Structures are given as structure tokens and as C-alpha cells.
Amino acid sequence: IVNRDSRNEMWSAVVATYTRALLDVTAQVHAVALEVLRAEGLLPAAARVDAADGTPPRPPQLEQLPLPGIPSSQVARVTSRMRARIREVVSERGILSTIDHVAELAQQHSRAQWQQQLRAAMGIDVTVGDPDLGLQVRAFRRTNTDLIKSLVDEHVDRVRRVLSDAGHGTRVEEIAEQIQAATGATESRAALIARDQVLSLNAEVTEARHAAAGITEYIWRTSRDERVRKEHKLLDGTRHRYDDPPVVDARRGERANPGTYYQCRCQAEPIIPGFDG
């Protein structure tokens, strides 16, 4: 059996890399949102609105500034401008190259994990070539490009709701605090995306490697910590076929292989024919 701590450390590093990248995107989104709101006169140029991890004191005279009700036409103009500017900035920062870098890191860790599994099963170092993983990598690229676009759109929609709900006499402080809360929600969503997507890519690449080696069965392995789902904990150490996955959510009756269910950190330990006795 491959050391679980070593295996988890490998993938935690990839998740951390992607999380940092998406949080950087979130910071860019936050900065552009403030830039547009200040340009529209909805926030004073000197007002401080920090990201969700801290709120330094703001000048009292700015906190108490009331705003008139914001016309729906202005809300539409602001959010349209904000959306376009954010997409431009995110594109300039080369998010596609970041996605590709994360995919390459995932493949490297998957390769190392595969070598460890072969060594554990066969007792010797075995060098094997990589299968064609182009399908999995292209799907990861496409899915994550769409997810980042949705991350931007969701943030702009949150800001739009803040502006639409601002009535006559709403203070700058209230708008600033609500935008800060919106940024915090976007940060949480970014972290979830990073973790789920890396885990899913690992599962898909692992299955492709196993299929290329003629492996059709696996042992379900969990991380054995307090975050493991009850159903998944019961599966730990059980044997399954890739083409007949077990039930992973009894309430919904959903079946899945390790790592393919939402936020699942479990992994498939291959059963290598001739070395499974």
C-alpha cells in the first residue's frame, strides 16, 4: 500500500498551487470592481475596501457619506463595464497558462504515484510510459476556463445585487461592507473549485493510467481523517471494478469511482493482475 501521508502531500501541493492562482484571480476581480465603482462615483476615491481577510479603519467622514438611490440604468452600466474589464484583466494575467501548468503538475504527481503503486505491488522499480492523456487535459482546460468565467460572473452578480438593493440614503460604509462580503464568498468559491478540480483530474488521469495497463479493478482508499464522508469511510479497503462503481451517496443513490464525486479525496489503489494475491 502506498503511504497515505505521502500521497496526500503530493496532491495537497497541487491543490495549494491552484488555490493560490484562483485567489489571485479573486483579488484582481475585487480590485477591478472597486476601480469601476470609484469611476462611477459610487465609492470615494480615498475609501478603503480591503479583501475579506481584513478591514482596516476607514475615515469616519467617508463612512457616513449617504448615497442617493442608484438608478437601474446605472447599475446595468456599472455591472456591464465591470464584467468586461474583469475579463480583460484576467485574460491579460494568463489564466490559461496557469490552468495548463496545474494540469502538468497533476500529471507529474500522478506519474510518481503510479510508480509508487507499481513498486509497492511488484517489489521492484518499473518504468512505464505515459498513456495519451490529451483527452483528460483538454477537458480540464475547458471546464476550468468555464468555471473561472462563472466565478467572475457570480461576483459581478453579487455586486449588482448590492447596488440594486441600495436605497436612498445608503451609506458608503454599507456598500463597502457588502462588497467585501461578496469578495469573501468569491474567495470561498475559488478554493472549492481548486480542490474539486484537482481531485477530479487526479481521478480521471489515474483511471486512464490503469486502463492503459489493463487494470480493471481497484481497492478504495480514503484519507482516513474526520472529513471523510460516512459512505466513503465504509468503502475504505473494499474491492471494486471501474465499470461498476459503488454507491457513494445512499440518499441520492449515486455511484462513482474514487475522486470523481464532488470534493471526494479518496483514491483508487490498483489491483494488478498477477500481483493481487
Model regions: which residues?
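N-terminal leader/targeting and assembly helices and adjacent pre-domain segments
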Residues: 1-185, 272-277
